[in-house]
Amino acid sequence: LPIWMKLNRRVTIITRFSGIMFSLLLLGGLAACSDDNNGNDTPEPEPSTYPTTPFSKIELKEVIESDAQPVTATHTYLYNSAGRLTSYTGKQSFTAGDELFEIENTTTVEYKDHQAVITDEAGTVSTYTLNDKGYATTCTSQDMAGNTRTYTFSYLINTEDKYYLENITEKLDDGKEYSFITIDYSNFRALRIQQKVDTFEHNSTATTPSGNEIANISEIPSLFITDMYPLSMHAVAIYGKILGEPANYLITQLIPDSNGESEETTTYTYTLDNR
């Protein structure tokens, strides 16, 4: 069976670094005519060749240790029966005294003709223009105050006609370029990443061990991607494959160049089940 037809597939991935623990739960069980977890079904957008995800739910838990009390952040992405992202819910939980506090917000995703519209609870609307393959070429994001940012995207296209994000460029209201990220895929074991925000520049290398690569059969985005500005503004689009496919192998280290402010190397370890 193709991967999207395999039922009850589960993968748990855990990584610990810098006092933060991530736990990622991916739930399979997609079938072409089934409803999502809430009993609702969103029609598959046209054309049917748009990229899809082989899961009905991705849940990422992040435990952040602090001097006060630990905060648990839960990120939940829900997909319809066609494998298209329909919503994201972010929740922060912490205990103060004997009382549990929770802060929750929801972001919705709607699909139109060659468009994906992502709206968060703060009223920010991001409209992505999609090419014929379903990948975004541009995005216009406007917040409640009327501030507008525009983004352009370019991709590396492999021999299987899959798109991998190569560049994102952000411009402000006045048309000035404010930030960008460029990813070089020349060596799939060592992705070179160039990042610039305003006048700050930072380069790093995302690596996977030579000869001992971990295949990304679950098709999950690299965890570090959504921590990098301006890609951090597009986490929902990344998990919806609106900004291309995830890397073919799981990244195990993110190593900054010596020209950056941070010299800290981030290490990722993974535990996977056998299903």
Task: Please give the residue ranges for each predicted region.
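Sec-dependent N-terminal signal peptides
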Residues: 13-23
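Generic hydrophobic-segment detector
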Residues: 9, 18-19, 124, 230
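N-terminal secretory signal peptides that target proteins for export/translocation
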Residues: 1-15
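Buried hydrophobic residues that stabilize the cores of well-folded domains
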Residues: 36-275
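C-terminal motif of bacterial Sec signal peptides marking the signal peptidase cleavage site
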Residues: 28-32
